[in-house]
Amino acid sequence: MRKLSLLLICCALAATPVSQARQAAPTPQAAVKYGFDEVAGWLTASAELVPADKYTYKPVNTVRSFGELMAHAADGMNWYCGSAKAAKDVAWSDAVEKGGPTKPKVVAALKQAIQGCNTAYGSSTARIDRLMANVAHSSLHYGNVITYLRMLGLKPPSS
């Protein structure tokens, strides 16, 4: 009888987290924010990982340099999150990419863009379609970043 009671208690305890997890489903806004936090962290870590002298590196001549690619990701965050918060569309700006994408400038711009996005993701009135598109755009370019890192002999932060 004692073994049966112990078995029943163990089964009940094991089932408790499962039932609680079903009740605690995240909101769509929270789920999208989770995705943004993940990819933004990887992009920031990548920007900090690559040495400053490699910001001009291009796998081939027909693509952006590493610095230009990271700057484009920051410009994208500024646009997607800015337009998610705005009552009307905002114009795309290549200010970071065209502003001489050195490591100090890119890392600072990326962190600033992430701060701006955190405001948008924290808003209950922000357009979730734009916030989702920001995660998609950032993830797409993080995929590019992985190739650059591997070609430079560096381990991607997500690995």
What are these model-derived regions, one by one?
Residues 42, 46-47, 81, 113-116, ...:
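Well-ordered alpha-helical scaffold segments within catalytic/enzyme domains
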Residues 16-29:
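Cleaved targeting-peptide boundary
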Residues 5-16:
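Bacterial N-terminal signal peptides
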Residues 97-142:
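Acidic/histidine-rich alpha-helical segments that form the ligand environment
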Residues 50-51:
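Membrane-proximal, proline-rich intrinsically disordered regions
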